[in-house]
Design a protein with these regions (language model features):
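Extracellular beta-propeller repeat domains
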Residues: 2-321
Length: 321
Protein backbone atom coordinates (compact mmCIF):
# COMPACT_ATOMS: atom_id res chain seq x y z
CA UNK A 1 0.00 0.00 0.00
CA UNK A 2 3.00 2.30 -0.07
CA UNK A 3 2.94 5.52 -2.07
CA UNK A 4 -0.86 5.63 -1.91
CA UNK A 5 -2.40 9.05 -1.59
CA UNK A 6 -5.57 8.18 0.26
CA UNK A 7 -7.54 5.09 1.11
CA UNK A 8 -11.19 5.42 2.11
CA UNK A 9 -12.52 2.55 4.18
CA UNK A 10 -16.08 1.66 5.15
CA UNK A 11 -15.74 -0.87 7.93
CA UNK A 12 -13.87 -0.47 11.20
CA UNK A 13 -11.48 -3.30 12.02
CA UNK A 14 -9.90 -4.24 15.32
CA UNK A 15 -6.22 -3.50 15.65
CA UNK A 16 -4.06 -0.84 14.00
CA UNK A 17 -2.64 -3.01 11.22
CA UNK A 18 -5.50 -2.50 8.77
CA UNK A 19 -5.91 1.23 9.18
CA UNK A 20 -4.20 2.41 6.02
CA UNK A 21 -4.80 6.14 5.73
CA UNK A 22 -1.51 6.99 4.07
CA UNK A 23 -1.42 10.76 3.91
CA UNK A 24 -1.64 13.88 6.02
CA UNK A 25 -4.31 16.18 4.66
CA UNK A 26 -5.96 19.48 5.49
CA UNK A 27 -9.48 20.73 4.86
CA UNK A 28 -9.55 24.50 4.58
CA UNK A 29 -12.90 26.19 5.03
CA UNK A 30 -13.91 28.83 2.51
CA UNK A 31 -16.51 30.61 4.61
CA UNK A 32 -18.05 32.75 1.89
CA UNK A 33 -18.66 29.79 -0.39
CA UNK A 34 -19.50 27.30 2.38
CA UNK A 35 -17.10 24.85 0.76
CA UNK A 36 -13.96 22.96 1.68
CA UNK A 37 -10.63 22.76 -0.10
CA UNK A 38 -8.89 19.39 0.26
CA UNK A 39 -5.08 19.51 0.11
CA UNK A 40 -2.64 16.65 0.62
CA UNK A 41 0.34 18.03 2.54
CA UNK A 42 2.40 14.84 2.78
CA UNK A 43 2.39 11.41 1.16
CA UNK A 44 3.99 8.72 3.31
CA UNK A 45 6.48 6.48 1.53
CA UNK A 46 7.04 3.84 4.21
CA UNK A 47 10.71 4.82 4.45
CA UNK A 48 12.16 7.27 6.99
CA UNK A 49 8.84 9.09 7.26
CA UNK A 50 6.94 5.98 8.37
CA UNK A 51 3.84 4.12 7.25
CA UNK A 52 0.24 3.77 8.46
CA UNK A 53 -0.28 7.08 10.31
CA UNK A 54 -3.62 5.85 11.66
CA UNK A 55 -3.80 7.77 14.94
CA UNK A 56 -4.51 11.30 13.74
CA UNK A 57 -2.60 14.47 14.58
CA UNK A 58 -2.14 16.98 17.41
CA UNK A 59 -1.84 20.72 16.75
CA UNK A 60 0.12 23.26 18.81
CA UNK A 61 -0.55 26.96 19.35
CA UNK A 62 1.59 27.88 16.32
CA UNK A 63 -0.40 25.61 14.00
CA UNK A 64 2.25 22.88 13.72
CA UNK A 65 1.02 19.29 13.47
CA UNK A 66 2.42 16.25 15.30
CA UNK A 67 1.61 12.59 14.75
CA UNK A 68 2.83 9.01 14.69
CA UNK A 69 3.19 6.29 12.07
CA UNK A 70 2.59 2.73 13.25
CA UNK A 71 5.49 1.20 11.33
CA UNK A 72 8.06 2.18 8.71
CA UNK A 73 11.04 4.34 9.49
CA UNK A 74 13.77 1.74 9.06
CA UNK A 75 13.97 -2.02 8.89
CA UNK A 76 15.28 -3.74 12.00
CA UNK A 77 15.48 -7.37 13.08
CA UNK A 78 12.86 -6.62 15.71
CA UNK A 79 10.38 -5.18 13.18
CA UNK A 80 11.46 -5.72 9.60
CA UNK A 81 9.26 -3.06 8.02
CA UNK A 82 10.30 -0.49 10.62
CA UNK A 83 9.23 0.10 14.21
CA UNK A 84 7.37 3.36 13.63
CA UNK A 85 8.01 7.08 13.74
CA UNK A 86 6.95 10.38 15.29
CA UNK A 87 6.71 13.28 12.86
CA UNK A 88 5.88 16.96 12.69
CA UNK A 89 4.47 19.03 9.85
CA UNK A 90 5.33 22.70 10.30
CA UNK A 91 3.46 25.54 8.65
CA UNK A 92 6.11 27.84 7.13
CA UNK A 93 6.01 30.83 4.81
CA UNK A 94 6.98 28.48 2.00
CA UNK A 95 4.25 25.96 2.76
CA UNK A 96 4.08 22.82 4.88
CA UNK A 97 7.38 21.17 5.86
CA UNK A 98 7.41 17.51 6.98
CA UNK A 99 10.07 16.23 9.38
CA UNK A 100 10.56 12.88 11.12
CA UNK A 101 11.53 13.69 14.70
CA UNK A 102 11.95 10.15 16.08
CA UNK A 103 12.58 6.67 14.66
CA UNK A 104 11.75 3.81 17.03
CA UNK A 105 14.31 1.01 17.18
CA UNK A 106 12.11 -1.69 18.68
CA UNK A 107 14.19 -2.33 21.78
CA UNK A 108 14.24 -0.32 24.98
CA UNK A 109 12.72 2.73 23.28
CA UNK A 110 9.60 0.86 22.13
CA UNK A 111 7.94 -0.11 18.86
CA UNK A 112 4.68 0.60 17.03
CA UNK A 113 3.26 3.90 18.33
CA UNK A 114 -0.46 3.22 18.02
CA UNK A 115 -1.67 6.56 19.42
CA UNK A 116 -0.96 10.11 18.46
CA UNK A 117 1.20 12.22 20.75
CA UNK A 118 -0.15 14.88 23.10
CA UNK A 119 1.41 18.16 24.20
CA UNK A 120 2.23 18.32 27.88
CA UNK A 121 2.17 21.39 30.13
CA UNK A 122 5.95 21.57 29.57
CA UNK A 123 5.35 21.80 25.77
CA UNK A 124 6.97 18.40 25.26
CA UNK A 125 5.33 15.50 23.39
CA UNK A 126 3.99 12.45 25.25
CA UNK A 127 2.87 9.15 23.77
CA UNK A 128 2.92 5.36 23.96
CA UNK A 129 4.20 2.43 21.96
CA UNK A 130 2.16 -0.76 21.73
CA UNK A 131 5.21 -3.04 21.96
CA UNK A 132 8.90 -2.99 22.81
CA UNK A 133 10.44 -1.62 25.96
CA UNK A 134 12.95 -4.41 26.44
CA UNK A 135 14.44 -7.29 24.51
CA UNK A 136 12.00 -9.76 26.04
CA UNK A 137 9.11 -7.63 24.76
CA UNK A 138 10.17 -6.86 21.18
CA UNK A 139 7.62 -9.14 19.53
CA UNK A 140 5.16 -9.03 22.41
CA UNK A 141 2.69 -6.39 23.51
CA UNK A 142 4.55 -4.93 26.48
CA UNK A 143 5.00 -1.34 25.37
CA UNK A 144 6.24 1.98 26.72
CA UNK A 145 5.22 5.49 27.68
CA UNK A 146 7.63 8.09 26.30
CA UNK A 147 8.19 11.80 25.92
CA UNK A 148 10.05 13.79 23.27
CA UNK A 149 11.81 17.03 24.14
CA UNK A 150 12.26 19.52 21.29
CA UNK A 151 15.72 20.89 20.47
CA UNK A 152 16.67 24.38 21.66
CA UNK A 153 14.85 27.09 19.73
CA UNK A 154 18.12 28.56 18.45
CA UNK A 155 19.16 25.26 16.86
CA UNK A 156 17.75 24.65 13.38
CA UNK A 157 19.95 21.82 12.08
CA UNK A 158 19.67 18.03 12.19
CA UNK A 159 22.51 18.05 14.72
CA UNK A 160 19.95 19.13 17.32
CA UNK A 161 17.46 16.23 17.37
CA UNK A 162 14.43 15.70 19.54
CA UNK A 163 15.40 13.78 22.69
CA UNK A 164 13.35 10.73 23.67
CA UNK A 165 12.95 9.70 27.30
CA UNK A 166 11.11 6.50 28.19
CA UNK A 167 8.98 7.28 31.23
CA UNK A 168 7.81 3.72 31.82
CA UNK A 169 8.38 0.25 30.35
CA UNK A 170 5.51 -2.18 30.83
CA UNK A 171 6.54 -5.60 32.09
CA UNK A 172 3.56 -7.46 30.66
CA UNK A 173 2.24 -8.72 33.99
CA UNK A 174 0.17 -7.09 36.71
CA UNK A 175 1.24 -3.63 35.51
CA UNK A 176 -0.40 -4.11 32.11
CA UNK A 177 0.65 -4.86 28.56
CA UNK A 178 0.03 -3.21 25.20
CA UNK A 179 -0.99 0.43 25.82
CA UNK A 180 -4.36 1.22 24.25
CA UNK A 181 -4.96 3.20 21.08
CA UNK A 182 -6.37 6.25 22.87
CA UNK A 183 -4.18 9.25 23.64
CA UNK A 184 -2.76 9.88 27.09
CA UNK A 185 -4.55 12.33 29.39
CA UNK A 186 -3.06 14.79 31.89
CA UNK A 187 -4.74 15.77 35.14
CA UNK A 188 -4.32 19.16 36.79
CA UNK A 189 -1.40 17.89 38.88
CA UNK A 190 0.57 16.72 35.84
CA UNK A 191 -0.06 12.98 36.19
CA UNK A 192 -0.70 10.90 33.06
CA UNK A 193 -3.55 8.43 32.56
CA UNK A 194 -3.97 5.70 29.98
CA UNK A 195 -5.04 2.12 29.39
CA UNK A 196 -3.43 -1.19 28.48
CA UNK A 197 -5.37 -3.66 26.36
CA UNK A 198 -3.87 -6.73 28.02
CA UNK A 199 -2.25 -7.71 31.29
CA UNK A 200 -3.21 -6.68 34.77
CA UNK A 201 -2.70 -9.98 36.52
CA UNK A 202 -4.02 -13.49 36.09
CA UNK A 203 -7.02 -12.46 34.02
CA UNK A 204 -5.09 -10.33 31.55
CA UNK A 205 -8.18 -8.31 30.61
CA UNK A 206 -6.45 -4.92 30.66
CA UNK A 207 -5.86 -2.00 32.99
CA UNK A 208 -6.29 1.71 33.58
CA UNK A 209 -3.06 3.22 34.88
CA UNK A 210 -1.69 6.44 36.29
CA UNK A 211 1.87 7.73 35.89
CA UNK A 212 2.92 10.25 38.52
CA UNK A 213 6.10 12.36 38.29
CA UNK A 214 8.26 12.07 41.40
CA UNK A 215 11.93 12.70 42.21
CA UNK A 216 12.91 13.14 38.58
CA UNK A 217 11.20 9.92 37.48
CA UNK A 218 7.72 8.51 36.98
CA UNK A 219 5.85 5.98 39.09
CA UNK A 220 3.12 3.74 37.68
CA UNK A 221 0.00 2.94 39.67
CA UNK A 222 -2.66 0.62 38.24
CA UNK A 223 -5.96 2.17 39.31
CA UNK A 224 -8.15 -0.58 37.86
CA UNK A 225 -7.69 -4.12 36.58
CA UNK A 226 -10.54 -5.47 34.46
CA UNK A 227 -11.88 -8.90 35.34
CA UNK A 228 -14.06 -9.70 32.33
CA UNK A 229 -17.37 -9.26 34.13
CA UNK A 230 -16.78 -5.49 33.99
CA UNK A 231 -15.30 -5.61 30.48
CA UNK A 232 -12.01 -6.43 28.80
CA UNK A 233 -9.69 -4.75 26.34
CA UNK A 234 -9.91 -0.98 27.08
CA UNK A 235 -8.51 0.02 23.69
CA UNK A 236 -9.60 3.65 23.44
CA UNK A 237 -8.07 5.28 26.51
CA UNK A 238 -9.93 7.47 29.00
CA UNK A 239 -11.28 11.01 29.30
CA UNK A 240 -11.95 13.25 32.32
CA UNK A 241 -15.10 15.10 33.27
CA UNK A 242 -14.95 18.39 35.19
CA UNK A 243 -15.14 16.57 38.54
CA UNK A 244 -12.05 14.48 37.80
CA UNK A 245 -13.92 11.24 37.07
CA UNK A 246 -12.49 9.05 34.29
CA UNK A 247 -14.66 7.53 31.55
CA UNK A 248 -13.81 4.94 28.94
CA UNK A 249 -14.91 1.85 27.03
CA UNK A 250 -13.90 -1.79 26.84
CA UNK A 251 -14.20 -3.51 23.50
CA UNK A 252 -15.29 -6.91 24.82
CA UNK A 253 -16.85 -8.89 27.69
CA UNK A 254 -19.01 -7.30 30.38
CA UNK A 255 -22.27 -8.75 31.66
CA UNK A 256 -23.72 -8.96 28.13
CA UNK A 257 -20.51 -9.94 26.33
CA UNK A 258 -20.27 -7.03 23.89
CA UNK A 259 -18.12 -4.49 25.74
CA UNK A 260 -18.87 -1.74 28.24
CA UNK A 261 -18.86 1.96 29.05
CA UNK A 262 -17.30 2.55 32.48
CA UNK A 263 -16.41 5.29 34.91
CA UNK A 264 -13.67 5.49 37.54
CA UNK A 265 -14.32 7.87 40.43
CA UNK A 266 -11.54 9.10 42.74
CA UNK A 267 -12.26 8.58 46.45
CA UNK A 268 -10.26 8.82 49.65
CA UNK A 269 -9.89 5.03 49.52
CA UNK A 270 -8.79 4.93 45.88
CA UNK A 271 -10.51 4.72 42.52
CA UNK A 272 -13.92 3.06 42.33
CA UNK A 273 -15.10 1.55 39.03
CA UNK A 274 -18.72 1.50 37.90
CA UNK A 275 -20.07 -0.02 34.68
CA UNK A 276 -22.46 2.47 33.09
CA UNK A 277 -23.59 0.26 30.21
CA UNK A 278 -22.98 -3.26 28.91
CA UNK A 279 -23.40 -3.89 25.18
CA UNK A 280 -25.28 -6.96 23.93
CA UNK A 281 -24.21 -8.51 20.59
CA UNK A 282 -27.87 -9.29 19.85
CA UNK A 283 -29.16 -5.82 20.66
CA UNK A 284 -29.68 -3.15 17.94
CA UNK A 285 -27.69 -0.70 20.09
CA UNK A 286 -24.51 -2.30 18.73
CA UNK A 287 -21.47 -3.76 20.45
CA UNK A 288 -17.64 -3.72 20.52
CA UNK A 289 -17.12 0.01 21.30
CA UNK A 290 -13.58 0.43 19.96
CA UNK A 291 -13.63 4.22 19.67
CA UNK A 292 -13.25 6.77 22.44
CA UNK A 293 -15.85 8.86 24.22
CA UNK A 294 -16.69 12.56 23.97
CA UNK A 295 -18.61 14.96 26.23
CA UNK A 296 -20.89 17.71 24.95
CA UNK A 297 -21.42 20.98 26.84
CA UNK A 298 -24.38 19.49 28.71
CA UNK A 299 -22.33 16.59 30.04
CA UNK A 300 -23.74 13.91 27.75
CA UNK A 301 -21.38 11.14 26.61
CA UNK A 302 -21.11 10.14 22.95
CA UNK A 303 -19.36 7.19 21.34
CA UNK A 304 -19.53 4.55 18.64
CA UNK A 305 -19.72 0.79 18.36
CA UNK A 306 -17.88 -1.01 15.59
CA UNK A 307 -20.55 -3.65 15.02
CA UNK A 308 -24.34 -3.77 15.14
CA UNK A 309 -26.78 -6.57 16.13
CA UNK A 310 -25.41 -9.94 14.99
CA UNK A 311 -28.85 -10.94 13.82
CA UNK A 312 -29.03 -7.95 11.47
CA UNK A 313 -25.44 -7.89 10.24
CA UNK A 314 -25.00 -4.16 10.80
CA UNK A 315 -21.77 -2.19 10.67
CA UNK A 316 -21.93 -0.17 13.87
CA UNK A 317 -23.86 2.66 15.53
CA UNK A 318 -23.35 5.99 17.31
CA UNK A 319 -24.57 6.09 20.90
CA UNK A 320 -25.07 8.69 23.62
CA UNK A 321 -25.51 8.45 27.36
Amino acid sequence: MRHSRLIFYEKVFRGPFLLGLLCVFILTAIVSARAQTFTVIHNFTGLDDGEQPAAGVTIDAAGNLYGTAWDGGHGYLQCQSGCGTVYTVRHTSGGWKFETIHLFLGGNDGAYPATTVVLGPDHELYGTTYAGGGQQCVNQACGTVFKLRPPPTACTTALCPWLETVLYRFQGGSDGSGPGYGSLRFDAAGSLYGTTIWGGGGTGFGTVYELTPSDGGWTENVIHRFTGSDGSGPESGVIFDQAGTLFGTTVDSGSQGGGTVFELSPTSAGWVENTLYSFDPFDPNGYFPIGGLLFDDAGNLYGTTSTEDEGRGGEGVHFSS
